[in-house]
């Protein structure tokens, strides 16, 4: 008998060779009907894989991220079969699951594929799926695998890099593919499919290699799910931050300035400034000190930190100074500069923690094909801070940072999130720097802090930064999409590299621990996500313009100006639309600009010293007439509901 531990901690005994599906049926027949994938001791397996040892078993349904991953990966196999049948002679390469679907990179050689072909590919995929063919894994020798793919240079290259005894094929119907595993039970579960697009993609992501065709698709267990997903995509297009940023006059790009380098227009700059001031106020209460570092640094600085070895290829080329023979880099990270700020003077344990904060702009050489609006740029500003503390202070400092992140999210309407504990890949420790002892200390500090704060957590191995583990906040937006926003990282490595010290109570020198944190991540990316999450209807306290005064005619311009002065006295951000347009046209334009309050002034309002309020997005609900003081109270109350006071 073997002992199987389930996620709820319960342990059940089964005969050796029991399959995950049999375990699922032992739990509940109804539950088993929905199980489509499993993992055993952290390794993804099929539901019919025999279990021969004690271990931890997780069973996945379509509602689980791992279940969707297996579903989409399996569909990529079926799509590959359909493509081979429809386009004989093509060469298949790789076909992984990705967020919201899958892709397969294919060498079509002289054949062409276009949007006009999508329907026939979808039809063939569904035709194969209806056959209810089982996905079956089987081990093969390296020689057998190479023989199978002797005419496919791409698969041959992949196989050549694998060790004998680790190679497996996946079969379904008459189709075979090189694969590590992780499939649904059979093709019959696939009920709806959509080919989304095709694009060029270099083999292995290297532009020196041949350009292949990447075929993107998605699939679902019900047609209804696909229909809802496509409707969601249409809504996402309407909320696209690039579209809204242009319409709301927040930011722009210029080919003369350069790709991936956003220009912030007055309204966007005001929005950024308001976010910065919001965080600075909270940070001041939490004991942070503002610092400023230059946009460039000597190459040797980033060699010392390890960033040059890790990110050198993603940095802009060094800047050379002819006279001194020095090499400078555009700053890729702020942390080395903050280490040098710490090193300016000696510290005692009584001085710690030191908390340095900076809205520091950094630069990365992103490939032009990877640039995307504000979410992937070449120059971006991080709300960076670094805390230098004693090992004894680490747990408490980490918890305080969590409190700050939760305050930021709560004030901006991000209520649905998961805290991802990102740890080392236990099988590939060479890609990380630092000692095992320090890594274990750092990982335990994060796990304990997240537990103490009652966060909803998931653990992801292999997602740690190269210098330390981290806590990533995975936020769901209004469309249900998941984004990685705030991050907190523990680092024992940089204090070693920069020889940071403090004098302890024992009068000896010790190394501080370093915490990296950025609740926004970057201003650019955060604003892009916030823009799409709110569809441009930002919280009232954040809006560049909270109200617009619409005069019914030129006769009431002076009263409109008087109203504006009174609003400014109440610190309400407003402007006047005094164009020679109809009130209907002015209202439509204000609606397009998503200004929260339209204040209409005419004869009655001037006579009574009032304003008529129309709320954005509430057409047909009627206006209310109030005094300026009453309106100021309405604004103040609404802001208080969303913008809480940060307490430490």
Curated annotation (Swiss-Prot):
Matching CDD domains: TGS_ThrRS, ThrRS_anticodon, ThrRS_core
PANTHER family per record: THREONINE--TRNA LIGASE, CHLOROPLASTIC_MITOCHONDRIAL 2, THREONINE-TRNA LIGASE
Binding site for Zn(2+): 335, 386, 516
ATP-binding listed as a keyword: yes
SUPFAM superfamilies membership: Class II aaRS ABD-related, Class II aaRS and biotin synthetases, TGS-like, ThrRS/AlaRS common domain
GO BP term, pick one: threonyl-tRNA aminoacylation
Summary of subunit composition and partner proteins: Homodimer.
Record's keyword annotation contains Secreted: no
Catalyzed reactions: tRNA(Thr) + L-threonine + ATP = L-threonyl-tRNA(Thr) + AMP + diphosphate + H(+)
GO molecular function, one term: threonine-tRNA ligase activity
Name of protein: Threonine--tRNA ligase
Main enzyme class: ligase
Cellular location(s): Cytoplasm
One Gene Ontology CC term in the entry: cytoplasm
Residue span of region Catalytic: 240-539
Residue ranges of every copy of the TGS domain listed in the record: 1-61
Comment on bound cofactor: Binds 1 zinc ion per subunit.
